[in-house]
């Protein structure tokens, strides 16, 4: 009851690393496109209806901003995931475990992983709390929604050339 959740949390932190790196690269690419197209005017649309003028730079900047907010969410969940109930045993009381194990194990894990691993301040609460998993799921889902939005917008703007918008050539 303490080992599997600790392993799962560490695995999630490990999985977030490459995802965050890829997201940073994409955010930078959108920022670069925003700078390149800061003065290229297009029409903004709402519900596929023409609305008001905007620049492609503004659109690409918006994509980058959303990705940066997702990266900030990743940064917020890592410390939650790094709080481990390792050594809390069956229900969080630590019964039958050496009193030094929790601190020793988390200190060792922090050293060998380079992660900000700490012992959960209340192991009984940590045993039942799913908040770190829920927050991580929400952060990843939000990233997925933002990526889908960008992909859908780019696909639509690239539609054509004869009967679609044909605003962009990706």
Language-model region placement:
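Conserved, well-structured ligand/cofactor-binding cores
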Residues: 1-170
């Amino acid at each position: 009851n303490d080992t599997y959740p600790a392993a799962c949390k560490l695995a999630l932190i490990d999985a977030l690393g490459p995802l965050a790196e890829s997201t940073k690269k994409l955010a930078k690419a959108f920022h670069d496109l925003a700078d390149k197209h800061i003065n290229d005017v297009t029409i903004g649309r709402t519900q596929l209806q023409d609305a008001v003028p905007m620049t492609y730079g503004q659109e690409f900047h918006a994509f980058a901003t959303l990705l940066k907010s997702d990266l900030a969410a990743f940064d917020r969940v890592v410390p939650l995931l790094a709080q481990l109930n390792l050594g809390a045993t069956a229900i969080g009381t630590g019964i039958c475990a050496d009193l030094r194990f929790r601190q020793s194990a988390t200190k060792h894990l922090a050293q060998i992983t380079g992660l900000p691993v700490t012992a959960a301040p209340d192991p009984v609460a940590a045993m039942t709390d799913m908040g770190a998993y829920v927050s991580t799921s929400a952060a990843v889902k939000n990233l997925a929604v933002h990526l889908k939005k960008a992909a859908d917008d780019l696909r639509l703007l690239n539609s054509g050339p004869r009967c679609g918008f044909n605003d962009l050539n990706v």
